[in-house]
């Protein structure tokens, strides 16, 4: 029996590229602009984007890449290794972090795009008695703002971000906190996600199951994910849960 459904946010409830591609572009090109003029390397914004799984020319984000599956801390760590040794430390420079936050607010605010029809299935699941939670590698405040933008924040008993104090996925602690908040055991809780980080969190937390959101079975992040657990949009989730309850 399932009591709690824990959702990843981007690529599951939200259209990852439509919502976040403008932010990724802005932050990468700003970061490249901070490279000292005396460096003889050849790294630009396009290279920084490619390193985190973003193809700027094609306008595509790889669901297996760092941008889709990691946190902003993971992105900064990846970029720092590519940048000159005498450049600012991205995770320590306050001006850089403030400027990035301004860019995120400017390019991300009011740009929340759902991945198809999401409100109706989420409300149906809530009506069916499931508790719902969000577990994202984005920040908690950003996740709450996104859910408010699409009118579904009221449905979630818990929203956990990478900065909420429980670590980031694929660690288990965010998932376990969602379970604690809902009064549900991990075995009675499932994770709905699209990346290896989501699947890894479910495995680490000993979740009851994992539902994958992917365009096709071949796009699932791990071959151990059962074919019948792959859906292309969450509007298929209420019917899937109904079938599972009959088993």
Regions found by a protein language model. Name each.
Residues 12, 136-138:
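Conserved phosphate-coupling serine/threonine residues in phosphotransfer and NTP-handling enzymes
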Residues 47-103, 116-119, 123-124:
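A metal-dependent, Asp-based hydrolase signature
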Residues 20-31, 53, 75-79, 97-104, ...:
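Hydrophobic alpha-helical core bundles mediating ligand binding, dimerization, or RNAP-core interactions
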Residues 1-56:
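Active-site neighborhood of HAD-like aspartate-dependent phosphohydrolases
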Residues 64-67, 110, 166-167, 229:
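Pocket-edge positions in alpha/beta enzyme catalytic cores
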Residues 1-5, 18, 33, 119, ...:
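Asp-based, Mg2+/Mn2+-dependent phosphohydrolase catalytic module
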Residues 109-115, 136:
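Conserved beta-strand/loop elements of the cytosolic catalytic core of P-type E1-E2 ATPases, chiefly
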């Amino acid at each position: 029996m399932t009591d709690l459904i824990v959702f990843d946010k981007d690529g599951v409830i939200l259209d990852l590229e439509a919502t976040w591609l403008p932010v990724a572009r802005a932050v990468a090109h700003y970061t490249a602009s901070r490279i000292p003029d005396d460096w003889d390397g050849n790294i630009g914004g396009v290279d920084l984007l490619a390193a985190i799984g973003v193809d700027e020319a094609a306008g595509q984000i790889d669901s297996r890449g760092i941008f889709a599956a990691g946190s902003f801390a993971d992105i900064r760590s990846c970029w720092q290794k590519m940048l000159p040794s005498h450049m600012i430390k991205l995770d320590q420079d306050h001006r850089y972090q403030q400027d990035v936050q301004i860019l995120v607010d400017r390019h991300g605010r009011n740009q929340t795009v759902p991945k198809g029809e999401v409100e109706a299935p989420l409300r149906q699941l809530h009506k069916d008695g499931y508790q719902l939670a969000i577990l994202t590698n984005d920040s908690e405040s950003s996740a709450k703002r996104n859910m408010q933008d699409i009118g579904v924040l009221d449905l979630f008993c818990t929203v956990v971000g990478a900065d909420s104090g429980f670590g980031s996925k694929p660690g288990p602690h965010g998932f376990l906190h969602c379970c604690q908040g809902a009064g549900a055991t991990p075995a009675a809780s499932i994770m709905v996600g699209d990346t290896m980080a989501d699947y890894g969190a479910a495995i680490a937390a000993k979740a009851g199951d994992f539902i994958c959101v992917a365009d096709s079975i071949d796009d699932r992040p791990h071959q151990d994910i059962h074919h019948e657990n792959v859906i292309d949009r969450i509007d298929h989730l209420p019917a899937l849960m109904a079938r599972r309850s009959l088993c």
